[in-house]
Design a protein with these regions (language model features):
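Juxtamembrane interface elements at the cytosolic ends of transmembrane helices
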Residues: 36-37, 42-43, 67-86, 144-149, ...
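Membrane-interface interhelical loops and short amphipathic "cap" helices
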Residues: 9, 34-62, 88, 113-136, ...
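Conserved active-site neighborhood of enzyme catalytic/cofactor-binding cores
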Residues: 112-117, 125-127, 132-173, 177
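Acidic, glycine-enriched active-site microenvironments
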Residues: 16-28, 32, 36, 40-47, ...
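Single conserved hydrophobic/aromatic residue that forms the stacking wall/gate
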Residues: 1-8, 12, 208, 212-217
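Membrane-interfacial loop-to-helix junctions in multi-pass inner-membrane proteins
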Residues: 5, 9, 13-23, 84-105, ...
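Alpha-helical transmembrane segments
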Residues: 66-70, 134, 138, 167, ...
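Helical transmembrane-bundle signal
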Residues: 19-29, 72-82, 104-114, 144-147, ...
Length: 217
């Protein structure tokens, strides 16, 4: 069936670009965060988890937030496939909208849980403190919200093709940029619990995968 064939072709293209992203992060783990690397000198006792992070909400807030970030990589991969194949149309919008919605839901829940935790954590300024790291998580959410409306419009009316692609790529780029800013130590934030400039530079190099945005006019 032609529709099933198109869906299969889109999935193959999406998977190709997604595998490139996964390979990049595997290199990141291997060269900067190897879990099997020896520690020398051997510490006599670990420092333990920061007391601020010893909260049940922190068992679900970061994973849910990062599930939203991971979803933006799938959207990004699909956008690249649509650019190369020239299939930025209603079928592509129908194909990608569920990933946009899933990512938006996870990112929304993650931000909400973080806000609730910040409310009862002493000295965090209420539900929203406009901390740099909080703002970093808000930017992809705003782009995802705009993309959600754009994709539904593209599916129904066949318009806003360029906006759908631009927002798809920008959302992923903002997620990567936010990760770089947090891990590199550039931002001075109350969220800064672990940073390493060398790891931040590696993440920054992965952001250049977004170069296809220059081809969009």
């Amino acid at each position: 069936h032609p529709t099933l064939r198109r869906q299969r072709q889109m999935c193959i293209r999406d998977r190709f670009f997604q595998e490139i992203i996964i390979f990049g992060f595997l290199l990141f783990i291997l060269f900067t965060s190897n879990p099997f690397a020896n520690i020398f000198p051997i510490p006599s006792e670990g420092t333990g988890l920061n007391p601020i992070l010893q909260d049940p909400a922190l068992a679900i807030h970061p994973p849910i937030l990062y599930l939203g970030y991971v979803g933006t990589s799938i959207i990004f991969s699909s956008a690249l496939g649509a650019i190369i194949s020239g299939s930025i149309n209603k079928s592509w919008a129908s194909h990608i909208k569920r990933w946009v919605l899933i990512s938006w839901v996870f990112l929304s829940i993650g931000i909400l849980l973080g806000s609730i935790w910040a409310y009862y954590e002493l000295g965090w300024g209420g539900f929203w403190f406009w901390d740099p790291v909080e703002n970093v998580s808000l930017m992809p959410w705003l782009c995802l919200t705009a993309l959600l409306h754009t994709v539904f419009t593209l599916e129904k009316r066949g318009t806003f093709q360029s906006w759908a692609i631009i927002l798809s790529i920008t959302t992923f780029s903002l997620s990567m940029s936010g990760t770089f800013l947090v891990r590199s130590g550039i931002l001075n934030s109350i969220h800064t619990f672990a940073n390493d400039p060398s790891r931040g530079v590696f993440i920054l190099s992965l952001i250049h995968i977004s170069e296809p945005t220059r081809q969009i006019r």
